[in-house]
Amino acid sequence: MKCATIVCTIAVVLAATLLNGSVQAAPQEEAALSGGANLNTLLDELPEETHHAALENYRAKRATCDLASGFGVGSSLCAAHCIARRYRGGYCNSKAVCVCRN
């Protein structure tokens, strides 16, 4: 009986918390939608800014080959990485980049 009371109390508190959070979030969403001119989209950015953002976020596929090569398991990790991505395996090439097989 005590267990059921505790579970019901926790459920009521969680429901009240979630309901309160959704009610408070609604005015912010309405304010964002009403100020449509202030929304930032990808089309608002200049191509040069987009290019620089892409270069900042560029990441070469070298982690499995470079970092694991010191332990002698680079090709095995590369093959496992490629199998996880639904390829038939993979290997580390001469530039220490993981190459997945079709």
UniProtKB/Swiss-Prot annotation:
Residue span(s) of the pro-peptide: 26-62
GO cellular component, one term: extracellular space
Compartments it resides in: Secreted
Effect in UniProt of substituting residue 34 to G: In strain: Gbab1068c, Gbab5010bs, Gbab5011f, Gbab5024h, Gbbkj16015a, Gbbkj16024b, Gbbkj16025b, Gbbkj16032b, Gbbkj16034a, Gbjo4i, Gbjo6e, Gbjo7h, Gbjo8h, Gbjo9a, Gbjo12g, Gbjo14c, Gbjo15as, Gbjo22d, Gbng3336g, Gbng3339b, Gbng3340f and Gbng3347f
Keywords: Antibiotic, Antimicrobial, Cleavage on pair of basic residues, Defensin, Disulfide bond, Immunity, Innate immunity, Secreted, Signal
Main location (coarse class): secreted
Outcome of mutating residue 37 to V: In strain: Gbab1068c, Gbab5011f, Gbab5024h and Gbng3336g
Induction: By bacterial infection.
Effect upon mutating residue 37 to G: In strain: Gbng3337bs
Signal peptide location: 1-25
Listed InterPro entries: Defensin_invertebrate/fungal (IPR001542), Scorpion_toxin-like_sf (IPR036574)
Membrane-crossing residue ranges in chain numbering: none
Keyword Ligase applies: no
Residue pairs linked by disulfide bridges in the UniProt entry: 65-92, 78-98, 82-100
UniProt keyword Membrane, yes or no: no
One Pfam family recorded for the sequence: Defensin_2
Family note: Belongs to the invertebrate defensin family. Type 1 subfamily.
Xref: PANTHER family: DEFENSIN (PTHR13645:SF0)
Protein name: Defensin
Species this chain originates from: Anopheles gambiae (African malaria mosquito)
Primary gene name: Def1
